[in-house]
Amino acid sequence: MVNQQLLDYIKQQLQQGMNNEQIKQSLLANGWQNTDIQEAFNTIMQVPVQPKKRRWKKIVLIIIGVIIFLIVGLLFLPKILNLFAKDIAPINDSDLKLQKVLVVDKDNAYFDLIKLGNVIYEPKDKSQTILDMVAGKTWDNQFAEEIISRNMQAFEYFAQAAQRPKYQNPESADPANITLNMILTPMNSWRQMARLSAIRALYLAKQSKNKEALDEALNSVNIGQKIQESQATLIEYLVALVMKEVGLETVQKIISSSKLTNAELKQYSQGLDKFYKNENGLITSFKVEYHFQSRAIDSIVSGDTEVLKSVVGEEESRNPEIAKKIKTYYYFQPNKTKLLFAEYARVNIKNANKPCGEIKATEVKPLALTNPAKLYTEENAIGKIIYDVIAINLTGVITKKCQEDLLVGATQAMITIKAYKNDTNNYPASLSELVPSYLSSVPRDPFNGKSLKYSATKKILYSVGEDMQDSGGSIGDDWRKMTDPTFKINF
């Protein structure tokens, strides 16, 4: 019987390309008998053994075939996937729709404000000096007089804008005009004017012209409120917020040294009530942003290359693969993409209506896969990329709205404490002592919905802040950055 080990060895050597004589000599050298070797050869010859080289050729051919199949498959994958792709029906976004707003030019503060850019005077090398003067860190009387004398025309336009009953940017008055191609009004001069107005107000206060000073400071607040009550973009809303903050902080500084009568102080305090109403304006600005996004998607579908460029960037917009995928339902599903933005807007609107203490930071998680290979098979990949590029976390904007409410309440309380001190030559033990003689109700802390905090001994008004923990007030230069946003009573 032929030895199986010998058979296996000979087969192995044959597969590796050795001939019979080479195998035989090797076996003889290792002690195998010639008769056993010959018998093994005879057995093997009955079943032909294919050399290993032929098996490798077959494997190579199989690999090449698989590669070709994959390449062809990838080339035709979009068309194959497109057969199974299906966008959802047009979404119901009626809750996010905007209406056409009509404001006659003579009632519109917009047309006064746009004149500021041509007449405003603010030396660039004095920007920090202006900021320090507004913040109360320094005072340069000569420079203040220069600012006032060189900006008389600008102050006139600003006062006229404050007296107009309404504000409405004509570009966003009609929803049909709200597109990514809409020309945005430059508003930097409006923020500049709020700072210059603050300097003028502080200058008037130093001249003991307290009523004129307060009226000047409140111009910024009145204009900011009008902008917030309009159909405004988010950028306009934020500019308005800054203008109101500058004006209200200036009011607090003027009150400290004012000689106004109690009747006048009460009148100014009551006049601040209207400045709490800013939620609807913020909600409208969120709807305007959604309108931008929805119209952008429509424009991309229609082949508007300029809109595509503004969304994905100039380099990517020239990429033929991007243009090809936009026309492929699998990679770009407009209605599903609109739904992403609609839900994003609704979350922000819901947060804007919540008490400030209940607002939780919402993380905008990227939807598109970062792996290029996986992205190639990702449904609505282009839509998700557009969402990732445009959607940002707006919780901070809502927090700023809450801070604005706090600033209004703190300013209101400070004015009435001043009136109380004028009457009694003392500070109230609590804010409730101001009701009803000086206040109709105690101002609320927007972060916990309870009464604004007050300490007669520390001479401070403060909020519990975003963490809603009462730490007894905080110390610092900027109340916005404090754990307990705190306002000093400097009188």
Per-region residue spans from a language model:
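Short acidic linear motifs
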Residues: 50-63, 67-491
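Eukaryotic low-complexity, mixed-charge intrinsically disordered interaction/regulatory segments enriched
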Residues: 1-48
